[in-house]
Amino acid sequence: MGTRYISALLIALSISLNLSAQKKSKGPIIKEYGAVWAIEQPDFKVDTTKTFRAVFDIMNSPESHDKVNASIETAARFLNMHAQSGVPAENLKAALVVHNQASKDIISDTAYQKRYGTANPNSELIKALQHAGVDIIFCGQSSNARGFPKEDLMEGVQLSLSAMTALIHLQDQEYRLIKF
């Protein structure tokens, strides 16, 4: 084998080992969801003294009825990445405003089972977010338009007049809109 080939192989192996050493980690706020990468020495620094308020506009959902909604898990990533970066948990405020296709993702396991033949894959994530103080707000217009009555919602989910109303109120309270 040539020296060039061995050098290239060693470089590739070194890069591979370095990449495999980098792993996403969950927690400390949401322990089972929201894995994030640690970013060593970022140029754009995180102000660990400020209060972060984020409202997540959750409208999309996977077509599969047995997959966790990645948009909802984004709230767990938000909490975990900032806590891992030194922001105290009490300085992290989050809310989800759920509507449109994502309406199904916040109904109880019983209601989900009746409609889709399986437990709601988002139940544990929603409970963990609520336990961490995240408000889950459901659009009343989607409730009626999509046929998800208040009694079908998971415990603790708040019904609002509309997603628009909730988003305006939260932004008036200095929550910053996160929409993907």
What are these regions (language model features)?
Residues 53-57, 94-98, 135-138:
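Structural recognition of the beta-strand scaffold that forms the well-ordered cores
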Residues 88-106:
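Acidic helix-start/capping segments at beta-turn-to-alpha-helix junctions
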Residues 57-68, 113-115, 156:
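Second-shell loop/turn segments in exported
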